[in-house]
Design a protein with these regions (language model features):
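Short aromatic/hydrophobic "clamp" motif used to bind/position activated sugar donors
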Residues: 105, 117
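Cell-envelope/extracellular polymer assembly enzymes that use nucleotide-activated donors
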Residues: 34-37, 65
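Catalytic donor/gating beta->alpha subdomain of glycosyltransferases that bind UDP-sugars
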Residues: 138, 144-146, 150-156, 161-169, ...
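Acidic donor-binding/catalytic loop of UDP-sugar-dependent glycosyltransferases
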Residues: 76, 122-137
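Short, acidic, metal-binding catalytic loop of nucleotide-sugar glycosyltransferases
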Residues: 54-63
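N-terminal membrane-anchoring/stem segments of glycan-assembly enzymes
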Residues: 1-32, 175, 335
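Membrane-embedded multi-pass helical conduit in multi-pass membrane proteins
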Residues: 273-349
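A conserved acidic beta->alpha catalytic loop
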Residues: 62, 70-78, 93, 124
Length: 367
């Protein structure tokens, strides 16, 4: 019994070590005015643009421009963008050695006129002072500012994403107890000044990378550019995989198939240990009916400790109710299923399908 207590204690502590301090955007505004060009790569994003663009038109600071890059959409993406009065860019046919999102971002950057470039995914929503706070952080830190949006989850089904959001934050390794440099940059929201963007090669330098901004962050740090990562808590939001359980399952399978090989060793060890502890709890629960009271009490205490931990960690990451935290055994088992299938995608099939395009999964991320 003592060995089990020690084992579960170590696994539980790993959860705190992997997300010791999650940095959020400061409320401090910039000292100087900045011209910001917002660039939105959009492939079949008609519905999402209707949510994002109104939040951009209502910002506390005046934007230089908003550019929507139509990445070969077959819905009303372009029409919706024009209805909101933003600039629409339609790139030439996708070159054979480029992936879609880097190509869209690169073309948007070429048309931009601002001194700061802000790349946003179409499924985001920004608080009224969100971009001003991003500018403030860029002014204080320089280089590249990267934000993982706060995940708004409304249904119980959507809250199955909780563990995945925790792992995504932990994988960046800059929020661990050891405060290491970021593993790269988050994909959905990235701000960089034009001069630095040009010097590091922009999206042309990572044109074949599936996780383009993760790789761009690495390229930037290799050239001694500062990369600072934040949670989007109370500033930048998104809502993913609200369409149903199937979309949620395969969406996270795709993300983990593409990202697992890029995770540094330290956060990988911490997250594997933590997940292992959670799965151990989930597997053990049915057997508590036939165990002695001391065993039941021990497992019950760790069940509550994991629930409290998940609720605490999720505060700055995404929506999470007490009921959702208490149902963590189902979350850990669901995570296991997704991880197994993502392993099959990455190691056996070696490709995933996303927005109608087949994407090869390889060490270099080549398409």
């Amino acid at each position: 019994m003592l060995s089990t207590i020690l084992y579960l204690s170590i696994m539980w502590l790993c959860g705190w070590f992997m997300l010791w301090n999650i940095r959020t955007l400061s409320d401090k505004t910039p000292y100087e005015p900045h011209s910001v060009s917002v660039i939105i790569p959009a492939r079949n994003e008609e519905a999402n643009l209707k949510n994002l663009l109104p939040t951009l038109s209502n910002q506390s600071m005046k934007l230089q421009e908003v550019i929507v890059v139509n990445d070969d959409s077959d819905d009303r993406t372009e029409e919706v963008a024009r209805e909101f009065g933003v600039t629409v860019v339609k790139p030439e046919r996708l070159p054979i050695d480029w992936l879609g999102k880097p190509w869209a971002c690169w073309n948007g950057a070429k048309h931009a006129t601002g001194s700061l470039l802000l790349f946003l995914d179409a499924d985001l929503e920004i608080e009224r002072d969100g971009i001003e706070r991003l500018c403030g952080e860029w002014e204080r830190n320089r280089g590249m500012i990267s934000v993982q949006p706060f995940h708004q989850m409304k249904s119980a089904r959507e809250k199955l994403s909780s563990l995945f959001n925790i792992i995504v934050m932990a994988a960046m390794q800059c929020f661990t107890l050891f405060r290491k440099k970021p593993a790269g940059a988050f994909g959905p929201c990235l701000m960089i000044d034009r001069k630095t963007y040009t010097e590091i090669g922009g999206h042309e330098g990572i044109k074949h990378q599936v996780l383009e901004h993760m790789e761009m962050g690495r390229v930037a740090m290799n050239q001694d550019v500062n990369v600072t990562c934040f949670s989007g808590y109370k500033a930048v939001y998104f809502r993913m995989y609200s369409e149903g359980l199937t979309v949620l399952f395969f969406g996270w399978c795709k993300s983990f198939a593409l990202g697992s090989a890029k995770t540094p060793l330290l956060p990988l060890v911490l997250t594997v240990a933590w997940i292992t502890g959670g799965i151990s709890l989930a597997i053990q629960l049915p057997f508590l009916l036939v165990q002695e009271i001391n065993e039941v009490l021990m497992w019950g205490i760790f069940y509550l400790l994991f629930a409290i931990q998940i609720k605490t960690l999720m505060k700055k990451i995404g929506t999470n109710s007490i009921l959702s935290a208490l149902s963590h055994p189902f979350h850990f088992l669901f995570f296991s299923l997704v991880y197994i299938w993502s392993f099959i995608l990455s190691m056996i099939k070696k490709e995933v399908k996303w927005k109608g395009r087949e994407i090869s999964v390889s060490e270099k991320g080549d398409a």
